[in-house]
Amino acid sequence: MRAILIDWLVEVHLKFKLVPETLYLTVSLIDRFLEKETIMRERLQLVGVTAMLIASKVEEIYAPEVQDFVYITDRAYQREEILDAERKMLVKLDFQTSHFSSYGFLQRYASLVDSDPFILNMARYLLELSLVEYKMLKHHPSMLASASLYLAQKIVRKPNAWPE
């Protein structure tokens, strides 16, 4: 179910034209919340849009409004439900909304090795694939970022740009 939710949130993220950091923070909020709270399957979409609402407020200059999330869920949830879920999520997470994202690490690593745009875009794609896969949660964000950049370089057969 997590993979289906994340896949749908990627589509929502694209529809709203949000920055990549918002998507990565959204997934982090979902995973940290679900570590602390058991949720029934039919409420998982609510958790997802709530996390994206919070992440948008943190990362975006112009965040989507609550009504946008009501619309995107085809009115499965009302404005008050989303706002109530936002309060509950923030309390459960002790208002800790920031995190070290694999995307942030990737940006830093790519600038260090002076990665060309094609390789960087491929690494971003590989990193986005890791968001959907539950097994990737056990890996540190810096490891996911370096692995995606390394793999992107190998796919295009670029010599190893990593310092020894």
Question: What is the predicted function of each stretch?
Answer:
Residues 1-164:
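Structured all-alpha helical bundle cores of eukaryotic regulatory proteins
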